[in-house]
Amino acid sequence: MTRHIILDCDPGHDDAIALILALAHPNLVPLAVTTSAGNQTPDKTLNNALRILTLLNRGDIPVAGGATKPLTRELIIADNVHGETGLDGPALPEPSFSPQAITAVELMAQQIRQSTQPVTLVPTGPLTNIALLLASHSELHPKIERIVLMGGAAGVGNWTPAAEFNIFVDPEAADIVFKSGIPITMCGLDVTHQAQIMDEDIERIRAIPNPIAQCVAELLDFFMIYHRDPKWGFIGAPLHDPCTIAWLLKPELFEAQDCWVGIETQSELTLGMTVVDRYQLTGKTANATVLFGLDRLGFVDLLVDSLRVYDPTYLNRR
């Protein structure tokens, strides 16, 4: 079964790897790639999406840039994690094609309207673009099958003690998304911190004789630098965003539970917190499938096997 998807991302090392993972699988049909500000500034995340698609020879996929700042707040970026370009590490090509002359919301609406089947939205950055789409195009809600997002946590945060970065950047947007009534799969820190890539996994990737695998290995080399800080307690580096695509491809790798999730938009201490009612204490109806567990080795095998797809036949087919 094929699934039509739109990837809304803020590349970002793990966003780039999520995109590479998705495009290795013909059962995922990418209708568009849209970009948000987050890991870097909006001009850089848009350019990075174009560079990755150029690397993959996928200039056929329409790309559009989205909101330049959160709905009501000033922009926060994570350049301390992703470097000056947002994709520091490998030498990436300059874009060979241009973005669409419309906004991310307009492109998403256009593609959803034209799609012959329901569309799955896969946001891996702040949820500003998705919230704007849902607010401005309520008539398209029935054509959105699911939102599979990277964001939030039932446990501790990674940007503040209570909040994960993507939700913290634009909590008002996240609030709109989680209240939309559209089915949601939440890939939060509870599961993404289990999706750690180790040094030996990077060497497996480096041993794959194609340029895409080499690029991913170099992305991971840089991504590892930030995550080696002992304060995190990691052995490797957590691949947050690829968990969204891995769940679409192999949901059996994950342990999940349907929960009610609320977004804190006001508190000084817990702004951006995803309040996950794992034990049904509120009596509220579940609005998200929350991922809690992962077969890490199966996840790494999926990534490695997917990177083998990028042989010369794939890269020269267009």
Swiss-Prot record:
Task: Spell out the molecular function terms from Gene Ontology.
Answer: purine nucleosidase activity; uridine nucleosidase activity
| Cellular component, GO, one term | cytosol
Active site positions, chain numbering: H240
Q: What is its EC number?
A: 3.2.-.-
Q: Name one Pfam family in it.
A: IU_nuc_hydro
Q: Output the superkingdom of the source species.
A: Bacteria
Provide the GO biological process annotations: nucleobase-containing small molecule interconversion; purine nucleoside catabolic process; pyrimidine nucleobase metabolic process
- Gene3D superfamilies referenced in this protein's UniProt entry, alphabetically: Ribonucleoside hydrolase-like
Family from the record = Belongs to the IUNH family. RihA subfamily.
What job does this protein perform? Hydrolyzes cytidine or uridine to ribose and cytosine or uracil, respectively.
The identity of this protein, by name, is: Pyrimidine-specific ribonucleoside hydrolase RihA
Name the source organism: Shewanella baltica (strain OS185)
User: What does UniProt list as this organism's lineage?
Assistant: Bacteria, Pseudomonadati, Pseudomonadota, Gammaproteobacteria, Alteromonadales
Chain's gene name: rihA
